[in-house]
Amino acid sequence: MGAFFVYILKASVYLAILYLFYSILLSKETFYRYNRTALLLLIPLSFILPLYPVHTAVPETYSNTTILDSLPAISYIENESQSKIPIGIIAVLSIYLIGILYFITRYVCTIIKLLRLIRSGEKYTDSDGLSLVVISQSIAPFSWFGKIVISKADFQNHRREILLHESAHIRKHHSWDLLAADLCIGLQWFNPAAWLLKRELQTVHEYEADNYVLEQGIDAKQYQLLLIKRSVGSKFYYITNHFNHNKLNKRITMMLKKKSNRKATLKYLYVIPVALCTVSVFAHPEISDELNKVSSVDLSNLTAMIGSSENTATIKNLSLIHISEPTRQAEI
C-alpha cells in the first residue's frame, strides 16, 4: 500500500509540472485538436514517468578504519516482530483511501441519477442518427456518450444550434476524454492539477464544439447570444458535456480570436524536454529516502495497527546467526 501511494504521489507531482507547462505555453493557442491531445497525453505520461528509475550517484565516503582479517566474522540478522509505522503515515494513507471511496461512491450515484433521467425522457432519433432524449425538466442541454439530453423548451426553440453543438461532442468522443480525466481524479483526488486538467479539457471540448457549429454556417452573433441566454441554466452532471459550460467569456473570445500561427505548433515539442526534466525531481537522495519509508508500509500492517486499541513500542531482537573464529591446534 505504501509503495502504491508513493507511486501516486510521484504521478501527481509529474502531472502538476506538466499541466503548468501546458497552461503557460499552450492553453491560449487555437489549435484545439492539438490542445486536447496534449491534455490527454499528460494523464498517461504522468503515470508512466514514476516507473522510470532514476538514481543519483552518491559520493563514497571512506573512514580511517583498520580492517583486521584475524577478527571473528559475526553476522547478524535484524528480526522485527512488527515494524513501527509513524502515526502520520497511517493518517495520510487512511485519508487517501477514504477519499478514493468517497469519489467512487459519488461517481456511481451520479451515473445512477443520470440513467434515471434518461429513462424518464422521450426517446427520438433524428435524421443524422443521433439519439435524443427530450425531458420536461428545465435543465441545460448535455451529451453523454451517444445520447443528447435536451429540454422540451430548447427542443422547440433552439433545436438546430443545440443539436449541432452536442453532436460535435458525440462525434469527437468527448465523453471518453472525461472518463479518462475522472479516472485520473479518482486516483489523484488530492491533486489540484488533476481537477484543473479536467476543467481545461472540458473548455477545449467547448472550443471544438463551438468551432464546429460556426463551420456549419450558424451566425456567430446569434450563436453567442444564445450562449449568453443559456448561461443561466442549471447543470447537474459533472461527467457530461454541457451546452452552457462555464467560462463563457473565454469561449466567445476564442470564437473571435485570430487563428494561431502554424509556427506555434513547435511549442508542443517542448513537452519532451519538460518530461525528461520532471523525472529528476525524485532523484535526490534526501527525497527518495523519505519516500522509501512510506513505500515500506504494508497494507496488512496498516489495518492491523488501525484496528488495534494498543500500539506498543517494538523491540528489536538481534539473533546471532554464525560466528566463525580462526582455529588452532593446541599441543600438550
What are these language model-derived features?
Residues 2-287:
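Membrane-embedded and juxtamembrane structural elements of multi-pass membrane proteins
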Residues 68-73, 296-309:
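Short extracytoplasmic/periplasmic juxtamembrane "stem" segments immediately C-terminal to an N-terminal membrane anchor
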Residues 289-296:
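Ser/Thr/Pro/Gly-rich low-complexity linker/stalk segments immediately outside membranes or between
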Residues 307-317:
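Non-cytosolic, low-complexity segments of secreted and membrane proteins
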Residues 319-332:
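Single conserved hydrophobic/aromatic residue that forms the stacking wall/gate
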